[in-house]
Each structure stands twice: as C-alpha cells, then as structure tokens.
C-alpha cells in the first residue's frame, strides 16, 4: 500500500506524519480520542452521557453533552501538567479486564498493573475479568477456571468476586467525581455558560471495548444510570481511527 500516513490527535483530528514529527505533543491521548470518535459514529449520544472504553489495561472516560464530546477548556493535562494541547475532556485510569488484583485487609485494589490473560482464557492468576465472570456480570471462557482463580484469593468465590467488582467500580466512580469537580471549576467563556452554568449531570453510561459489558453493567447499577453498549462496541476504537479527519487551526493577529 502506497498512501500518506496521518496521526490521530487528542481532539479527534489527524495530522500528517511529517507534522507529527515536528509537534509530537499533538499525539498525546490518541487512543482515547479514537474511542470518542468511534462512539460518536456508533451512537451519537442524545443525552448527557459518560462514555467508558474498557480495555485490558486501562479505562478511558469521556463526557458528552448535546451529542458532542466535551472539550478540555485548558487543553490536555499530562501527569498533572497542563499542555494547552486541544483535547477532549477525558481521563485514562489503570483498570481493565486484565488488571492485577491487590488484596487488602477488608477489600481490594484493582490495577493499575496488567496481570495478563484472565484465568478464564488460560491465564494463571485471577484478574478483574475473572471476578466479573464469577460475580455473574459477564459470561465467557472457562467459568470454572475463573471461579477457581478467585477462590485461590481466599473466601467464598462469589463473595470475593463481588468485593473485587465493587472495588473497581468505586475506583472508577472516584475518577468520575474528580472529573465532574474539575469541569465545574472550569472558567466560563460564553454567554450560554453564564446563563446555564457549567454543571454536568450525567443521564446514562456508554460502554465500549472488550471489557465493557460486565464492568459497565456493574457501574450502572452503582450509579443508578442506564447503560448503552452499542452494536460494534468491541471495535469502537478502530472505527474511530477510520472516521477521523484532518483538523487545522490558525492564529490571527
């Protein structure tokens, strides 16, 4: 194949490879941006929504209002530092289907390390996917292997699995609360912002990615929100990369 190469940007646009080499910072958060574009192509949310792309290692979270993804008003933040790079208002956290499980005195911490394949599909140690299977949120692979891996952590398998899922859900809810607080503290730039305010009240969850069906269902129960997993959700990221288009900006003086 002889074709020009374009790199996805954090705002969902693309730029030529040559330009990306000159401005590599524009390529931050390209994976999460592809997921946002994929969701827009698959379902175009009509109500205020929180989307979550759940992979094996991370979960990418974005907000939607009036069918459009919210943009980070101060640009992308990397490791706590503002970059002024135009980007969606999103956050990536180290929780996914293959996340390692850390047992504490009374609960669990999920991630951020990736353990590897779930026991249900041939792995040797329990992961979040095994907990979701054992707790009945999703069904795939060898469910007996998943239950045995959870049992090896100690305690009754279903009870332990529910603890693990609850811990993952609480970690995600904490991140969502932080994102909501961050958005509410953003400066207002338009008359509409002054009139309506900047408070964002989610009305549904949208799940995409291989780990979405089980985890988003559990999160929806905890947040008392309906859940939408659109057709094609497993490949939303690839769809987003395919529909991306070039974007340009110009400064006027």
Please identify what each model-predicted range represents.
Residues 56-57:
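Short acidic, Gly/Ser-rich segments with clustered Asp/Glu that frequently serve as metal-coordination loops
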Residues 23-51, 60-253:
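Helical "lid/coupling" subdomains associated with nucleotide-phosphate turnover
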Residues 2-18, 210-222:
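Acidic-glycine-rich active-site phosphate/pyrophosphate-binding loop
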